[in-house]
Swiss-Prot record:
Subcellular location: Plastid, Chloroplast
PROSITE patterns registered for this protein in UniProt: RIBOSOMAL_L2
PANTHER family linked to this entry: LARGE RIBOSOMAL SUBUNIT PROTEIN UL2M (PTHR13691:SF5), RIBOSOMAL PROTEIN L2 (PTHR13691)
Lineage of source species: Eukaryota, Viridiplantae, Streptophyta, Embryophyta, Tracheophyta
GO molecular function: rRNA binding; structural constituent of ribosome; transferase activity
GO biological process, one term: mitochondrial translation
A GO cellular-component term linked to this record: chloroplast
Stretches with biased composition (Polar residues): 1-31
Entry keyword Repeat: no
Gene that this sequence comes from: rpl2
Domain of life of the organism encoding this protein: Eukaryota
Residue span of region Disordered: 1-53, 222-273
The protein, known as: Large ribosomal subunit protein uL2c
Family (UniProt): Belongs to the universal ribosomal protein uL2 family.
Amino acid sequence: MAIHLSKTSSPSTRNGAVNSQVKSNSRNRLISGQHHCGKGRNPRGIITAGHRGGGHKRLYRKIDFRRNEKDIYGRIITIEYDPNRNAHICLIHYGDGEKRYILHPKAIIGDTIVYGTEVPIKMGNALPLTDMPLGTAIHNIEITLGKGGQLARAAGAVAKLIAKEGKSATLKLPSGEVRLISKNCSATVGQVGNVGVNQKSLGRVGAKRWRGKRPVVRGVVMNPVDHPHGGGEGRAPIGRKKPSTPWGYPALGRRTRKSNKYSDNLILRRRSK
């Protein structure tokens, strides 16, 4: 990733960094109308996810997670910024004239990619898991055949194919979870780009607010009506044996997954909290 440091004309540019290879494009038939965000509220207007709100208006980019242009080569034209995800996207021009957006694989610029059953194991190519050798690094993994990739789509995400037996393949996901998936499901070879997004300095708090992120306030400094840790005189303790969420549930490691989900039999090892 080519990081460009601006001239130190102000504190925000002095501490910020920009990827000079990423472009911005708002005139494209693959870009639809305004993408509405809930700002952390449910349909009744009650806060269900804190520290969200504001932010710039966004246009939605139609991403091709299915990769169903079989045996048709496409060339990566541009790497573009997508405000709806932390991974970059790239515009693909296929040989039949089709144009699509896909997640940008790491370290690919101006290369050709293809989807098929007997294509080379090359960064950016998509193929079924049954045609991949063990140990292949993959992303954009299907769970249901033909539905499109649903796993390992964030910036820097990468999974590993560790076993194949019968009709299933065993994958180690970025969270550390080990689970079974049908060998007929497809995935893309390589790692998602924009790996250093967590280490990137935004330069100023305004850049964070543009992304719809609000300040994080500790519950212990709130009022009792706002948080179970709130209230008291001065720097008072939380007043409970264990920390709690804003809704009174146990915090710090409580399992939130339902105990009777259909996919429990497919998960060989749970992710670590």
